[in-house]
A protein has these predicted regions:
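Acidic-basic catalytic patches of nuclease active cores, encompassing PD-(D/E)XK
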Residues: 1-54
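Conserved catalytic cores of phosphodiester-cleaving nucleases, focusing on short active-site segments
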Residues: 17, 50-52, 57-95, 104-107
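Intrinsically disordered, glycine/charged-rich C-terminal tails and inter-domain linkers
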Residues: 38-54, 65-69, 73, 126-133, ...
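Switch/connector loops and helix/strand junctions flanking conserved nucleotide-binding motifs
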Residues: 82-83, 114-121, 145-147, 334-338, ...
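Catalytic NTP-binding/metal-coordinating core of nucleotidyl cyclase/transferase enzymes
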Residues: 212-295
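Catalytic core of nucleotidyl cyclases, primarily class III adenylyl/guanylyl cyclases
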Residues: 263-292, 307-349, 403
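Catalytic/regulatory signature loops of cyclic-dinucleotide turnover enzymes
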Residues: 329-330, 351-373
């Protein structure tokens, strides 16, 4: 006799496992393109939840790099065969308007326990359009890739084994960034969380920064502040009977949003409920950082639509809208320690944060509303997509000159 509670726990475990494997596969793909020690690794763009230009269809991962065709990665570990085929039909049976030049799809799947694996492989090849090669990463191949990339073995896919693997990978990333000199730094977890190893490596190599020099309590000038918020969040929560569905939706949003920020060279500051706070130009101002912040905002719009789509498929009541809305501003911010003589936990304050929050409140779903000073830092070619707004009245701030950018909605209430 089956145990419904145990079955539900296994389903939720598989969801978390797939999210974790997505993170691992992103690092593997980046490693395959640039290795561990290339400061120019920002040339390899590894994006998650990419809108394929088909209603309700998002690629789990898209990998782009110079002089190579992009390719897709689909993490379908634990999916039933029929469900996996349905997803490939929706995503890859016809050309993608947004990624038309991709040349292959990597399917990350579990072979063990699938008596129909050969038939599944044949079905997926049949439903995938002919110009896309199909490659499989099963348990054995994934073990090889994890060992090649991180130098550690992929052990048991259990909660305990995965906790150990994550900690081992974080230790290795810290060494990639700083070498052996700072292995005992108390800032390891905090800085890896805020920046990711690639950005830390860049700061260490370009400026010689030690961990304690990266985010000291001080003023940072001309930082871009990005605030993103899930639309209709309260409605989604109200209509969700299973708390695990809500928690999984938020974890998916957090994981993908953090990846988008770090992948764009930004700093993930914090999550508050369904809101993301990210900074660009901290601790150093890089060429093109304002444009990368906007690119990150566009990625977050796609991530928000994808998360809302998945959430809608789990509940009965149809939600009128889904996605995110975003506010952005530029200005000085201050980093502040939460406790004396402790750099592990910091807060961010500044007028630019308050201004971005006011603009966020004015943004509709799938819109980015930006302050005029930030708008003027963008290349002229980017101005054409923006629409000037009427001056906005903001409490305790005054009238604000702002611009908005609307991106077509990818939110869909259809599909399973």
């Amino acid at each position: 006799m089956t145990n419904p509670q145990r079955n539900a726990e296994h389903v939720h475990f598989l969801r978390q496992l797939r999210l974790f494997l997505e993170e691992v596969c992103c690092e593997i793909c980046r490693f395959q393109v640039v290795g561990h020690h290339d400061v120019g690794s920002e040339e390899a763009l590894v994006s998650r939840e990419v809108d394929l230009g088909v209603p309700g269809a998002f690629a789990d991962i898209v990998v782009r790099s110079p002089n190579r065709p992009p390719f897709f990665v689909e993490v379908k570990y634990g999916y039933t065969s029929d469900r996996m085929v349905d997803h490939f039909v929706r995503k890859y049976s016809r050309p993608s308007p947004s990624v038309p030049d991709a040349d292959r799809v990597v399917a990350v799947v579990d072979r063990a326990g699938r008596s129909d694996f050969e038939q599944l492989e044949e079905r997926l090849r049949k439903e995938t359009r002919k110009d896309l090669k199909l490659e499989f990463w099963d348990e054995a191949r994934l073990q090889e890739l994890v060992l090649e990339c991180f130098g550690v073995k992929l052990g048991a896919l259990s909660p305990e084994g995965l906790f150990e693997l994550r900690n081992a990978i974080d230790d290795i990333k810290w060494r990639w960034a700083f070498g052996e000199r700072h292995v005992e730094s108390p800032l390891k977890d905090s800085l890896l969380w805020h920046f990711g190893y690639s950005r830390l490596l860049q700061l260490h190599k370009l400026h010689g920064f030690a961990p304690e020099q990266i985010l000291p309590p001080r003023r940072f000038r001309n930082a871009v502040v990005l605030l993103a918020d899930l639309s209709s969040f309260s409605s989604f929560v109200r209509d969700t009977r299973d708390d695990e569905v809500m928690r999984n939706a938020l974890t998916t949003f957090y994981s993908n949003s953090r990846h988008a920020v770090i992948n764009s060279g930004g700093m993930i500051c914090q999550f508050v409920g369904d809101e993301v706070l990210a900074l660009f130009g901290v601790p150093d101002v890089q060429d093109g950082y304002a444009m990368r912040a906007l690119d990150c905002g566009r990625s977050l719009l796609q991530i928000g639509s994808s998360v809302s789509n998945r959430w809608q498929r789990e509940i009965d009541r149809v939600q009128p809208s889904g996605g995110v809305h975003i506010g952005m501003a530029i200005g000085d911010i201050q980093s502040v320690m939460y406790r004396p003589f402790c750099r592990s936990h910091i807060g961010i304050v500044g007028d630019a944060v308050n201004l971005a929050a006011r603009l966020l409140a004015q943004a509709e779903t799938n819109e980015i509303v930006v302050a005029n000073a930030y708008f003027q830092t963008l290349p002229d070619r980017e101005h054409s997509g923006f629409e000037e707004m009427e001056p906005l009245e903001a409490k305790n701030v005054g009238l604000i000159k702002a611009w908005k950018l609307h991106q077509g909605s990818s939110y869909s209430t259809r599909g399973a």
